[in-house]
Amino acid sequence: MLKRKAIASIKNWVNTKNKKCLVVQGARQTGKTYIIERFAEDNYEELLEINFKQMVSAVDIFSGDLTVDNMVMAMRFRFPEKKILPGKTLIFLDEIQECQEAITSLKFWAIDNRYDVIVSGSLLGIDYKRASSYPVGYVDYLRMYGIDFEEFLWGMGISEDMIGNLCGYLESKTVIPEAIHSQMMNYYRQYIAIGGMPEAVQKYVDTKDFREVDKIQRSLLLGYQYDIAHYATAEEKVKAEKCYLSLAKQLLDKENHKFQYKEVEHGGRAQKYFSSIEWLLRADMVHLSKLVTDVRFDLDDYARDDFFRAYTTDLSLLMAMKDFSLKQHIVENTLEGNSKGGIYEYAITDALYKKGYQLYFYKNETTKREIDAVSYTHLTLPTNSL
């Protein structure tokens, strides 16, 4: 089983006084359901899990009065084998986008405050807009991402103490011994080729077989395409899929990594496709890095909405859009040309995205110098040399 940092975040939520319902957000197949189930197993006497895709008729639990007592009574009749006890039972509503009344009910669970309720689902940014009454102010949020490089190292057997020792070299500005550096670069190239989707990482941990990983990556990509076909409006289905499948070409096949609509379709224009990018963004299928015209606070004040780079939400999905040989070149360190620059730009951007940073990039029109990833932290960034 892969160790995930999100477990600690859920523990913090549980220990919060007067906690609200927890909404676990994130892209498809990033491990949301697995993490919640594992957490419940270790921290509660009972887990009551309702997956609204699997249990279609379970929506009836939320069809009447949405008082907590009524909902709990309906759950007890539906699941008589389950003990539903305050503080001892975790109520987990999965694929909640399939039941809009369950979304509305979160307000009443939070006000009542006797039961611990966690919800999750795919494309919540799309479906929450259809809820009859969204529970603003009554939910806490946890965003889950694919596995990051540190979590990948844990999966490969590298302990936290070993990683701490490595960080010690960096913090003291000491040269890392070549044997360690070389092995870490091998791990990093493996991680780039595999990506952070838990199923792909677990397959590599178990088999060390990139061909098996490739099968999973392509299956995951098909799942994303299915979601576009299933959830997008009739007007957006084809356009959103075209935009999504163009991302590898946008990032790896040309020197300029700006998202260009002409790469989606010959003669393509923003007027036709920008709404599809917005849909993919709300659906947690892409994240964007916008051009900023100046590197100063607040970066968003200098951002251009019409000039951006678009990335898949995990490296696994980018790998699935390209031939298997790309993984071979990455692992063997034989990448050249635009693909090499694009892959490593993407890898750094992916790492920052998984830390929760809003990303931008900068280009000085006078010197033509570029910074591929710009974000704001408590650190002061020198700008006089740009």
Give the label of every model feature segment.
Residues 1-11:
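N-terminal pre-Walker A segment at the start of P-loop NTPase domains
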Residues 24:
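Hydrophobic anchor at the beta1->P-loop junction of P-loop NTPases
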Residues 32:
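Conserved lysine of the Walker
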Residues 35:
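Hydrophobic positions on the alpha1 helix immediately C-terminal to the Walker A/P-loop
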Residues 57-81:
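Short glycine-rich substrate-engagement loop in P-loop NTPases that contacts/grips substrate
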Residues 130-249:
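Interdomain motor-coupling "hinge/lid" segment immediately C-terminal to the ATP-binding subdomain
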Residues 206, 212-371:
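Accessory nucleic acid-recognition modules appended to NTPase machines
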Residues 377-383:
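Conserved small/polar residues in nucleotide/adenosyl-binding loops
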